[in-house]
Design a protein with these regions (language model features):
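Hydrophobic alpha-helical transmembrane segments
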Residues: 3-135
Length: 135
């Protein structure tokens, strides 16, 4: 499968995975900053979001994956990631964020709202960037 860097897909997955890392390097970081701003608009703990982002944004095999995940964990006071099972094999991974509280089912709509506000900020930023060229 494209994007997989483990056997038996390594021969066809390594180049697409690395290309994805390069192409999404800036968008991942911009998205993290937009998510932090969205958290501020929603009254979430932006200081914790920034602190966890600075500390945990590199705690993933992909250089881009933990960017927004770390902001989200900090904003909501959650501990995310950690060990995971893939295809019957346990992969030991670092945690992202602090376990300030237990994850509950109420966190699902909170994260959905956070993602929606982040996406709206991205849309506004895109429109603002395009506006000078439209005139």
């Amino acid at each position: 499968m494209l994007g997989y860097v483990e056997p038996p897909y390594k021969n066809i997955g390594l180049v697409p995975a690395k290309a994805d890392d390069v192409v999404n390097y800036i968008p991942a970081r911009l998205s993290a900053l937009l998510m932090l701003a969205a958290g501020g608009l929603m009254g979430l703990d932006t200081a914790a979001g920034w602190r966890v982002f600075r500390r945990d944004r590199r705690k993933h095999a992909s250089p881009n994956s933990a960017q927004t995940e770390s902001v989200c964990a900090g904003l909501l006071g959650l501990r995310l990631a950690g060990d995971a099972w893939y295809h019957g094999v346990l992969h030991k991974k670092e945690y992202i964020g602090d376990a300030s509280r237990e994850i509950t089912h109420e966190d699902i709509p909170r994260v959905c709202r956070l993602m929606t506000v982040t996406a709206l900020l991205a849309l506004l930023l895109s429109c603002a960037a395009k506006l000078p060229f439209a005139l």
